[in-house]
């Protein structure tokens, strides 16, 4: 088959492309930049450009829509709508133009509220979405667009994967930032670290996306997180131990952390610079952000890696020479 991956030069897209290439599929890796790993399969195009999407999808059988605007410091915030909602609409336009009937779409658990309906087990797919930020709102609106598309033709298949924070070699998201701060000795635990986090390793995420090719006609919605969840203290301790340090390191009261975050927010507005610390990042760091991923077991998918395997691999690839005190 010929398979298109929007965001195909990203770290999830690259891992997925490797699995698909191994099976002999032809790829169209659509991104704003050329794939370093698969340059011959790259198509430079912007998901916000409808004509470019239609041209890029010529001859495609299946679309993986991974491209998104997801940073939490985007300005203007309207870019979330432009890229995530408008980009999704353009992908659908391309699917209709070329008679493509299968779309696999990565959404986000940011569509759920910070406080889940089931605090013990986390939000599941039956719970009412209630996004807590502009990013989550845009992903929910994009989901609705794809949900409408799948009902238009009985031959259509939609797999929507609500992803938690995903980490792995090559990623420069929040988990990398945390690891980098720990490795450089600049990290201090905010709060007592008892809050739990649902996270996922890129090797498992790409494996499930690959597995999603086997799902039949209709609409399929899944939360994805690698289990069991870790609390923040255990998570930080695991990273520190992999870097040759003991324990969770220094700690700061939550109220003091919020005050510090507000100072950085003011500085960001005055200077126009982006800082690694903000109120929203501190709140997210200290909150329980867990989801229920039990439903995914119905697909018979088995994650090939444990969370420990994933953390060890990322630290080995990104920080193996780092031995600074923390």
Q: Model regions: which residues?
A:
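Mid/C-terminal beta-alpha module of Rossmann-like enzyme folds, strongest
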Residues: 212-276, 311-315, 321-326
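Conserved Rossmann-fold NAD(P)-dependent oxidoreductase catalytic core, especially the SDR/UDP-sugar
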Residues: 90-134
């Amino acid at each position: 088959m010929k398979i298109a991956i929007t965001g195909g030069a990203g770290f999830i897209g690259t891992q997925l492309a490797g699995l698909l290439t191994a099976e002999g599929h032809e790829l169209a890796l659509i991104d704003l930049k050329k794939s370093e790993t698969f340059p011959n399969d790259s198509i430079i195009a912007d998901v916000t450009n409808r004509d470019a999407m239609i041209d890029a999808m010529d001859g495609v059988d299946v679309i993986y829509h991974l491209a998104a605007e997801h940073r939490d410091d985007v300005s203007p915030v309207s870019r979330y709508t432009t890229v995530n909602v408008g980009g999704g609409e353009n992908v659908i336009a391309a699917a209709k133009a070329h008679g493509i009937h299968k779309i696999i779409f990565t959404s986000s658990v940011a569509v759920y509220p910070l406080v889940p309906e089931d605090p013990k087990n986390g939000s599941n797919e039956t719970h009412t979405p209630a996004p807590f930020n502009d990013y989550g709102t845009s992903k929910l609106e994009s989901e609705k667009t794809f949900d409408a598309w799948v009902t238009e033709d009985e031959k259509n298949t939609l797999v929507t994967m609500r992803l938690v924070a995903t980490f792995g070699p090559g990623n420069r998201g929040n988990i990398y930032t945390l690891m980098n701060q720990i490795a450089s000795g600049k990290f201090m635990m905010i709060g007592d670290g008892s809050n739990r986090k649902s996270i996922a390793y890129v090797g498992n995420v790409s494996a499930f996306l690959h597995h999603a090719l086997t799902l039949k006609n209709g609409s399929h919605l899944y939360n994805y997180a690698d289990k069991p969840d870790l609390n923040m203290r255990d998570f930080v301790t695991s990273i520190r131990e992999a870097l040759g340090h003991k324990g969770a390191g220094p700690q700061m009261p939550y109220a003091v952390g919020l005050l510090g975050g507000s100072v950085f927010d003011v500085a960001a507005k005055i200077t126009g610079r982006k800082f690694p610390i903000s109120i929203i990042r501190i709140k997210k760091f200290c909150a329980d952000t867990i989801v229920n991923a039990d439903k995914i077991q119905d697909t018979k998918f088995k994650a090939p890696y444990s969370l420990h395997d994933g953390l060890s691999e990322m630290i080995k690839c990104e920080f193996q020479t780092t031995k600074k005190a923390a």
